Amino acid sequence: MILVRNQIPLIALVLCGVLFCWLVLFWLITDSCHPIAMLTMPMSPVWTLGNLIAVFAMWVVMMIAMMLPSALPMILMHHRMARKNNQSFENISFTISYLFIWVFFSVLAVVLQFSAQKTGLLDPASLTTTKIISIILLIMAGIYQFTELKNTCLSKCRTPAGFFMGYWESGVLGAFKMGTRHGLFCLGCCWAIMLLLFVGGVMNLTWVLILTIAVVAEKTLPAGELISKLIGVGLILAAAYIGYGLFYGESMQSMSGMNMECMAQMKMS
């Protein structure tokens, strides 16, 4: 009980950090005419240095907002174990190294966004320009939910006690290594879901929140493994729905065109 009380400041600090990041995202989206917000949505395939820095900062803030909540149980468990060993700075090292992994992912995301926008696969709002790309990303993320790698990484993320029993290292450097390892497991668990940001839009706060809830649910709720599979099924069904709409729409347009041609020929005759 004493440990729980001692962890209240840590919980408050983490939640305040998450809230701050969400408020920054909300500001960027609602005040899109602000010069900084405009830098995060490059209108040209040729980015300026300001665009590069702003987009990277946006991704870092978004990753903290999305991924830190699901890491809270692991951070609290490490804090509890570190306090028993009288090592007060280890928890900071663990958390920072975990976030470094998502900073690294943000670098990759910026490179991917720049490359995709340059080739016309993404628009300035970071949305896929064709439904085919969205379908591919949804199917890929849906199938990945059923893979062994996903299950292994999810299991490591869901069991803080088991993780530290298997990988515990003492000292600040040891905590840094454990945080990095946990971050890599988390990245292995969630990278495919993160790519879905390009389906609903990086600047779509509702979509970002939906993906965050999905990540938190599968990593922290008691039925997380089942939730993970249901997410996979839902993503595949969403891809099928979009694919059906795309095929049906094209078929209707084709039939409409044929009908127009027939009517024109009848009028001429």
Regions found by a protein language model. Give the residues of each.
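A small-residue-rich subset of transmembrane alpha-helices
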Residues: Q87-S115, C189-A223, L230-L235
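Alpha-helical transmembrane segments
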Residues: G50-A65, L127-I143
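Hydrophobic alpha-helical transmembrane segments in multi-pass integral membrane proteins
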Residues: S106-Q113, F185, A240-S254
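Juxtamembrane transmembrane-helix termini in multi-pass membrane transport proteins
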Residues: F56-L99, V103
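Histidine-/acidic- and/or cysteine-rich, low-complexity loops and terminal segments associated
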Residues: M1-V60, Q117, L121-S126, E148-E169, ...
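Residue-level signature of transmembrane alpha-helical entry/exit and packing/kink sites
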Residues: L10-V14, W47, N51-V55, E90, ...
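Transmembrane alpha-helix/helix-exit interface in multi-pass inner-membrane proteins
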Residues: V103-L121, K131-T159
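Alpha-helical transmembrane segments of helical membrane proteins, especially in multi-pass transport
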Residues: G142-T152, G174, M178-V202
